[in-house]
Amino acid sequence: MVLLAIVGVIVYAVMVWPVNPTRMKPAESYEQLRDTVEKKTDIRVPGEDLLPWTVTERQLRMDGPSRLAKVSGFALSGTMERGGVAFSAEVSVGVTGVVGDLPSPWDVYRHVPVYLFRNQGFYMAQLYIDGSEYIIQLHYPENVTLPEEDAAYVEDALQAACHNIIDLNEG
């Protein structure tokens, strides 16, 4: 009986021991990421051509750090360039609720409000569809001031990406 209890404790410890402390798990390919996320959640994964970028990393978001954790979203990371400025970019989604007050929408497409946050070195578009929070972030060096034309290009790319995500979920 004692041996059974010891084995039970060991099995439990192995199952709940953190294997993904960041709650992110690498995906081998875009296809594996899309298939896994769409099979195990209600989240739709946009194509890698969502932004004018090069995707460098694909990750599954997990709902916890243990072996028993379930897929709860994804993150695609990459780089893009405009006007000689290098941007790091990330598209991610997870199940969440709206927290705090949001500003007035930057855009409303198909009745879905899109919020834009920007600061020196940073752009973030955020939208909520069926309980999932989609976030697109672009970071660039804070000491760089984007010319108006490049800033408009970035905002147009963000808006097109948000519309693409909304269309994907409406279809």
Kindly give the residue locations of the regions a language model identified:
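Hydrophobic membrane-insertion alpha-helices, especially the h-region
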Residues: M1-M15
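Compositionally biased, low-complexity segments enriched in small residues
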Residues: V11, T36-V37, A160
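Hydrophobic single-pass membrane-insertion segments
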Residues: A13-M24
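Short, flexible coil/linker elements and helix-boundary hinge sites characteristic
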Residues: W17, T41-D42, G84, N143, ...
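Short, solvent-exposed recognition patches
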Residues: P26-Y128
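A short, solvent-exposed beta-edge/loop patch
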Residues: G100-G171
